[in-house]
From Swiss-Prot:
UniProt remark on cofactor binding: Binds a second Mg(2+) ion via substrate during catalysis.
Pathway in which the depicted protein is active: Carbohydrate degradation; glycolysis; pyruvate from D-glyceraldehyde 3-phosphate: step 4/5
GO BP, one annotated term: glycolytic process
InterPro entries according to UniProt: Enolase (IPR000941), Enolase-like_C_sf (IPR036849), Enolase-like_N (IPR029017), Enolase_C (IPR020810), Enolase_CS (IPR020809), Enolase_N (IPR020811)
Species name: Lactiplantibacillus plantarum (strain ATCC BAA-793 / NCIMB 8826 / WCFS1)
Binding site residues for Mg(2+): 242, 286, 313
Domain of life (superkingdom): Bacteria
Protein name per the record: Enolase 2
Amino acid sequence: MEKQVIETVKAREIFDSRGNPTVEADVILSDGTLGRAEVPSGASTGEKEAVELRDGGDRLAGKGVLKAVNNVNTVINHALHGADPFNQAHIDQIMIDLDGTPNKARLGANAILGVSMATARAAANALQQPLYRYLGGTDLELPQTFHNVINGGEHADNGIDIQEFMITPVERTSFRDGFEKIVNTYHTLKKVIEDAGYTSGLGDEGGFAPDLKNSEEALQMLHDAIIKAGYTPGKEIAIAFDAAASYFYNRTTHNYDFEGKTYTPAALGDYYLQLLAKFPEIVSIEDPYGEEDWDNFASFTAAHGDQLQIVADDPVCTNPQLIRQAIQRGMANNILIKLNQIGTVTETLAAIRLARKNGYATMMSHRSGETGDTFVADFTVATNAAQLKAGAPARSERVEKYNQLLRIEEELGADGARLAHFPNNVMFD
């Protein structure tokens, strides 16, 4: 049988869960096999992320992606014609070299990533393998999931500055068992919010976005919902939050303007400790300090990283060079991984390997502007990333990721599927 090569690469402009344009890419092999991928987009974006190419101008508020689509249909299509789809690293390197910039500003990370993901899908389809199996082989595990059930910050129009309040299933006999506990808690939380006199409208990621007084009130509602759903906080369901502190970091004063008050970095750290004391079921904090405030980020890790998961997102942006620097500085103990922050499957794999090699955990992540594409679910299982955050158990673009994990568990066999837990499980000893 003749070996398949890439015949055609093409793209189109579609729309994401926020109604914004994004790129959908097709990779078609010489035997007609199709791989298709849809590219997500973030609202809370780190300054060091690869460039998402937008059209500018009046059309669609300047957010069109026809330039990126054209780059796929012309330059990338020409360069990849006849290439080997089973050599992912080579495909990605061709596009990186073709772009020629350090942040993919010429062709657009949204163009390059769409093709990178679609290539992996085409190769898996050609071999008649599930994507997670093609990318990961046989040593696979289902992730610990983190669900953003109260939205604040850039993800909601309310007065809360912390961006994501998450719940995660601790005790679970299967992925389905853990997810059902999350669903029960989510529906209970809706009633807790409404009983307190707030509306229960949804934010970008499917979590509720009530106009609460402050972040402590949000945590209290999570605590109450866990108990009312019939679970023990910290034992069966734990809490995590993403401060996304870059968005309330004052670059002039180097302080933090948070929910009507100004905090020095030390005072902000004390505030987090007060929350931990009141809600000991908090097990993970993401971006407690701004992406430029590496010293305080590292100091907080040194002081509390042995008892708390501390996740770095905006300071490192899935970039292996930045991850290496963060490791050298002792910043965080978990690296958030987002495919579109770096822009290719191969570079994302390199970021995960680098973190793991240095004893860091990893958490895969969706973006606030999502599509129905489930690539991130397969990728999480394939890489044994151990943790995944993909939003609340609501809104189809979020739930579809979890539904895909349910399918994967079924395919692996519920009894034999390995479940990931926190590395060095210090939080639950």
